[in-house]
UniProtKB/Swiss-Prot annotation:
Superkingdom, taxonomy of origin: Bacteria
InterPro entries referenced in this protein's UniProt entry, alphabetically: Acylphosphatase, Acylphosphatase-like_dom, Acylphosphatase-like_dom_sf, Acylphosphatase_bac, Acylphosphatase_CS
HAMAP family found in the cross-reference section: Acylphosphatase_entero
Family of this protein: Belongs to the acylphosphatase family.
PROSITE patterns: ACYLPHOSPHATASE_1 (PS00150), ACYLPHOSPHATASE_2 (PS00151), ACYLPHOSPHATASE_3 (PS51160)
Record-linked Pfam families: Acylphosphatase
Organism: Escherichia coli O1:K1 / APEC
Catalytic activity annotation: an acyl phosphate + H2O = a carboxylate + phosphate + H(+)
Gene3D superfamilies: 3.30.70.100
Listed name of the protein: Acylphosphatase
E.C. code: 3.6.1.7
Disulfide links within the chain: 5-49
């Protein structure tokens, strides 16, 4: 498998519902590095890097709604080239 990085924006009821923390848990379980952070517009930004198949699993998890308390309306993602090395999956 090749290594890839993506950046995704998740829209809906995704702040104040544990979205970043459960995303971190799922990403670490899949062996990914990157981060999840809240944006001012109420969305969450996720950068995930790792094996292509594992990154795709995280994207599918995000699209399926994330944690039970969240309500995901839309997920946009694209390839990403982070400026620095990501050694863990963090919450920002």
């Amino acid at each position: 498998m090749s290594k890839v990085c993506i950046i995704a924006w998740i829209y809906g009821r995704v702040q104040g519902v544990g979205f970043r923390y459960t995303t971190q848990y799922e990403a670490k379980k899949l062996g990914l590095t990157g981060y999840a952070k809240n944006l001012d517009d109420g969305s969450v930004e996720v950068v995930a890097c790792g094996d292509e198949g594992q990154v795709e699993k995280l994207i599918q998890w995000l699209k399926s709604g994330g944690p039970r308390s969240a309500r995901v309306e839309r997920v946009l993602s694209e390839p990403h080239h982070p400026s620095g090395e990501l050694t863990d999956f963090r919450i920002r």
